[in-house]
Structures are given as structure tokens and as C-alpha cells.
Amino acid sequence: MSRYTRPPNTSLFIRNVADATRPEDLRREFGRYGPIVDVYIPLDFYTRRPRGFAYVQFEDVRDAEDALYNLNRKWVCGRQIEIQFAQGDRKTPGQMKSKERHPCSPSDHRRSRSPSQRRTRSRSSSWGRNRRRSDSLKESRHRRFSYSQSKSRSKSLPRRSTSARQSRTPRRNFGSRGRSRSKSLQKRSKSIGKSQSSSPQKQTSSGTKSRSHGRHSDSIARSPCKSPKGYTNSETKVQTAKHSHFRSHSRSRSYRHKNSW
């Protein structure tokens, strides 16, 4: 047997052990498959209660293998236990106390890191930095692009507004022209209506004037003594004298003619 080879492990590690389980109970169950050297149920250093697992050490490896094969996944003291070969040597109570206080110290964790883990960490950190840089660059580009788009939109908006105003102004002018035309037509219709309403009055007044003028002329013909309008008193006197002389001459002629008959 070489000095570098270790003796075969004869200890079994048992999980899911009930709190009420005693070492005598485990010794009775496992002692069926061979002589047992030691049974150990670790207790909590502060509460003094079982921690839920136990160790059973046999004298022969073949006995330990038989116990593992027959009792694994079996019900012992009200629980289904799991059995496997223990890894490492049995720890002392002082080692268990330090393990409970410091289950995994950061210094041990740092020391236990392998160079490959350190390399992967450095790579992951560099990858994270590169990713952050790329994200920041993307954000800056996105901001610039959005800013340029907002600028272009702000520049294009006034042009659209001016074009919209230019396109709207002719409509307003057309509307004002239509309104002015409608107003002028209304004024013309009103003036025509007024003229039509005033024309009958004028006609009636002209008719009354013509009638009065005819009556006046008849009165002048009947009464020659009255002076018509537009003649002076001397002219009227001369005309009346001539008219009377003509009447007297015609009467004398008619009288002579009668006497001749």
C-alpha cells in the first residue's frame, strides 16, 4: 500500500434526521449491517438543538456500503433519511463553532478564488464598462437625433403656417368680395324699390298737374278777361281789346247778312 493513498472512507453522512432522534436509535438501525465505531449528531452551539444531520462510522467499508444501499430513502424515526459517504474528516466542536459564526468569510472567499475566476471577473467588469459606454453613446446619439428632429420640425412649422395663411387669405378676400357684392346688390334693390315706390307718387302728381293745367286753360278760354300765366297786365288788355273787336265785327257781318235775305 502506497503512502500517498488514503484509507477508504467508512463514515456515512445522514440527512433529514428528526430532532428527537438519539444516537442509540441510529446505532440500532445501522448496527444490523456491521460493527459501528462511532455515531455523532451535531448540536447547535448556542441553542443545543440537533442540526438535522448525523454521522455513522463503520469498521469496514463493505458494511458502510451495505447500509447505504439498504437504508437510503428509508423511514427512520418518522422521517425519510438520505445517506451518502461523508467527505473529509470529522470536525471538532471548536471547528463547528467557528463554522457557525463565520459560515463563509469574505477573506477566505477571496483567497479561494482561482486565477480563472479572477480573469472572468475582470472580463465581466470590462464587458460591463464597455456596455455602459455603448449605452451612453447610444443615449447621446438618440438625444442628438431627437434634438435635430425637434429643430427641423420647429423650422418647418412656421413655413407651414405662412403657407396656410397665404392659402387662407384669398378665401377671406373672396368672402369679403362676395359680401361687398351682396351688400351692393341689396343697396341697389333698396334704391330700385324706393324709386318704384316714389314713381307712382310722381305720376299722380304729374297727372294732377296736367288736369289742373287743362282746367286752367279751359277757364282762360271761357273767361278772356282773366290774364293767363306768363303775360303782363298791358298785354292782357291788348288781347282782350282785340278779341272784343273781332266779336263785334263778326256780329255786324251776321246782322247784315240777315237783313239782305
Swiss-Prot record:
Biased composition regions of type Polar residues, renumbered to the chain: 230-239
Sequence ranges of Basic and acidic residues compositional bias: 88-109
Any one Pfam family match given in the protein's UniProt record, by short name: RRM_1
MF GO annotations: RNA binding; RS domain binding; unfolded protein binding
PROSITE patterns hit by this protein: RRM (PS50102)
Domain named RRM: residues: 10-88
Chain's role: Splicing factor that seems to antagonize SR proteins in pre-mRNA splicing regulation.
PANTHER family noted in UniProt: TRANSFORMER-2 SEX-DETERMINING PROTEIN-RELATED
UniProt protein name: Serine/arginine-rich splicing factor 12
Natural source organism: Homo sapiens (Human)
Gene name, Swiss-Prot/TrEMBL: SRSF12
